[in-house]
Amino acid sequence: MSMIDYKREPKSDIAFVDMKSFYASVECASRGLHPLKTSLCVMSRADNSNGLILASSPLFKEVFGKSNVGRAYDLPFDIHTRKFSYYNAKRQGLSTDPAYIRFIEEWARATVIVPPRMDLYIEKNIEIQHIFQQYGSIEDIMPYSIDEGFIDLTSSLNYFIPNQSISRKDKLDMLSARIQRDIYRKTGVYSTVGMSNANPLLAKLALDNEAKKTHNMRANWSYNDVTTKVWGISRLTDFWGIGAAIEKRLEKLGIYTIKELANYSPDLLKKEFGVYGVQLWYHANGVDESNVHVPYKPKSKGLGNSQVLPRDYVKQQEIELVLSEMAEQVAIRLRSIRKKTTTVSISIGYSRFEESTSFRGQMKIEPTNQTEELQKYVISLFRKKYNGGAVRSISVFYSSFVDENITMLSLFDDPEEILKKERLQTAIDAIRSQFGFTTLQKANSLTSASRSIARSKLVGGHSAGGLDGLK
């Protein structure tokens, strides 16, 4: 029995709508294929074995046992020949039984592999947002990501379904079914809905833990379901907001289930986790005071950029060129929010054929947001750590921000020279903002190793128009 008096808790009618395998479903629909009956995956850089699987249809996941994110070399078949890959199978401990090989090759030939089209996904997301707005005001809608979001239907239920003999729970289900229908008719995408006549948390838990398994892809969790459904969640990490690190800390306290968390002392949880511990306790008891009408705005902890290179970079000069370009790209974002960084970090991932896997570096610096200075710091960090080898992925990250009007001068600094450089940087940013990033480029950006021009054409780090990896 919960210690919470739910009669005192606020109630709202919430639908949390999630597009089923969104990118893959959009690709299926655009080709006239059934999203649930087609084996399809969206793969960036499908022209090489390091191609990144961004999304896949439910059938693809079922057949090949893969989640959304993975690499082409994780598949049991060669993406070019569609033949069974004994090398990949051996590396992953898969069967090489002839029947299994035939099964994989049959499905490999039937599988559609397509490049990402980020502009199309954004276009479909906008269409879905317009559908949401037919059932609630803009203030009632809180996008959670490109393929999911909350709708507060509290004010809409009686408007769309005025029959007073129907319960609010049934009205919420009926209206959610209409939203599902409209999304499918407009976009060809199936959607799953977690519902709650209580709060957003329970709607999200209903989606993650039940709705995805029901025949109509809907489920409702409200206050009267807390002790049976919320406490019945089998794994701590299946609960919203609990990752592997938090799970380990909870287990050290002797907490292995959501029910145990809900009945633990909130004071002891606060002692271990601070205010977050109290929030965990309330959430485990189904209480959530977040408001869809006031979207959560996370405090910025840093800005970064990461990319997987199109090939192995072996020459140090080429690696440093990409590092410099990325240092500049993140510096531009830093200036756009009028901040300076005091901490620079890099992460370098080696080719999978190298013995070493990766290394990281970090340094504290005087506050700056100037491209030239940040490039020097990034390159300096790299040179301290790099001992040769083929590099395949690079990340640059700035953190520990201060306001841009803070400047630290030494006796050897020339204030006029600093001001001159800042004015030049401001002018360059303004030109690029109006006419595009590639308007002003250094000569080395035209070399084959450069990534700045290619990446300026991407949306969300991936191809906007679907030509990625195609000749």
Stretches with model-predicted labels:
Residues 1-150, 155-157, 284:
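Residues that scaffold, gate, or flank divalent-cation-dependent active/transport sites
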Residues 4-9, 16, 62, 238, ...:
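DNA-contacting surface of Y-family translesion DNA polymerases
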Residues 26, 360-471:
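Acidic, metal-coordinating catalytic segment for phosphate/diphosphate chemistry
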Residues 108, 143-148, 195-199, 339-343, ...:
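Short Gly/Ser/Thr- and Asp/Glu-enriched loop/turn motifs at secondary-structure junctions
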Residues 146-149, 340-354, 397-404:
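Core structural elements
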Residues 150-180, 254:
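Catalytic palm subdomain of template-directed nucleic-acid polymerases
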Residues 175-237:
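Long, highly charged, low-complexity intrinsically disordered interaction regions
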